[in-house]
Structures are given as structure tokens and as C-alpha cells.
Amino acid sequence: MNKQRTLSIIKPDAVEKNIIGEIYRRFEKSGLKVVAAKMKHLSKAEAEGFYAVHKDRPFFSALVEFMISGPVMIQVLEGDNAIAKNRKLMGATNPKEAEAGTIRADFADSIDANAVHGSDAPETAAQEIKYFFSDIEIVG
């Protein structure tokens, strides 16, 4: 057993489509437990800070603008191999390349409006969780 926590963000496009419950159902069906959650409309500074690792990439400005275009649902997921499990549920970054039945294949519109974000490694998961949640906000 490798119990982990990972950060997940349901992005503005998916929140707009009113599919938060469907995405949560997929988390829970795969054995992931939501141990913290909040809905938030990110400020530009929050989005820039969260995605600072990409600040020199050509897509940075568009990503920030997209992430502040509407509310997001941010959650901490916990479970065995939570990081890999969540990434498998999400599917490839580009929904056209995502396996059928993944969140992105089913709900994402484009590589930019791709429905969800998930941490990619234990180190980034820890940093991303701390960015949005204090220890007392996480149950379990």
C-alpha cells in the first residue's frame, strides 16, 4: 500500500459544464477519497503563482487567463497511489490523445480547456496542496 495525497483542480470549463459531481463520482469509484475541497475564483496573482513553473513557456499567459476565467473546484485526493491513479483518470493533457473513458476524453474541449489538473509527482503534490490548503483544512 502506498497511501498518497494529490491535488486536483476541476478547471473553469468543467465547472461551467456542471460536471463536478460526475468527476467526483469517478474519483470515488476509483478508490480516491476527497479529504479537502473548496470552490474558488482564482485571482491573477494566485494563478500566476500556482503555475510559476511555466512562467517562461509560451502558453503561460493563456493558461493564467483561462484559469481566472471562472470558478474552479480544488480538492485534495487521498488513496493508494493517488497521484498515478488520478493521472490515469484524467487522461492525456491533449484530450484528442486521451484514452476513451478518461475525464479529458469525455469532457475536455481542447489542450487548453482540458477540464482538470492533477499533481505529477509526490514533491509537486506536497507543494500544490500547501499552496491552496492549510493542514487544518485537510481531514484524515
Curated annotation (Swiss-Prot):
Keywords: ATP-binding, Cytoplasm, Kinase, Magnesium, Metal-binding, Nucleotide metabolism, Nucleotide-binding, Phosphoprotein, Transferase. GO terms for cellular component: cytoplasm. InterPro entries: NDK-like_dom (IPR034907), NDK-like_dom_sf (IPR036850), Nucleoside_diP_kinase (IPR001564), Nucleoside_diP_kinase_AS (IPR023005). It comes from the Bacteria. Its main location: cytoplasm. The active site is at H117. One of its GO terms (biological process) is UTP biosynthetic process. It is an enzyme of class 2 (transferase). Its EC number is 2.7.4.6. It catalyses: a 2'-deoxyribonucleoside 5'-diphosphate + ATP = a 2'-deoxyribonucleoside 5'-triphosphate + ADP; a ribonucleoside 5'-diphosphate + ATP = a ribonucleoside 5'-triphosphate + ADP. Homotetramer. Belongs to the NDK family. This is Nucleoside diphosphate kinase. The gene is ndk.
